């Protein structure tokens, strides 16, 4: 590679990194604004004003507000997927995943709200669902230590997710007890996750016998 080509390559790399960094900034600011004000009350103009990035530049990253919402949801599930990616320490991976879901309750609630906002857009929902399923499959693998993500493995993942969702609903409830303690909930769900991951996986034959 000549010096000129090397300089050009380096320039392109820096340009690409700046683009990625700016995109992440847009997503983070959008997420914060929407968590505070609600998805429908935050416009692209509002995001542009808060980030100091021109509206036209934002549209270079996302073709519409809907595209921005999809990207926020995809990033959310991708982050959870990465937290579960510790093959050498699955117990810690599960613990980090649970804490991220409950300590970051505002974010989890935001994802639900923006998903409801996109309820009439099947293509958007399909893209978000792909990210969710990818994360759920990883969760199933971590819980059972199995490469399969069907049957009992997926059931365990869904049980754990249901517990987390229940805790999030309780956090939002106007009937929430004054003594409600997020840390206690996190610890309780960690114990449940430990039980789920320590239970031996039934063979397919055993599972069939359960229903006889």
What are these regions (language model features)?
Residues 81, 96, 122-148, 154-158, ...:
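Amphipathic alpha-helical packing segments from all-alpha helical-bundle domains
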Residues 69-76, 131:
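Alpha-helical DNA-contacting segments of helix-turn-helix folds
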Residues 51-62:
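Short hydrophobic/aromatic patch on the recognition helix
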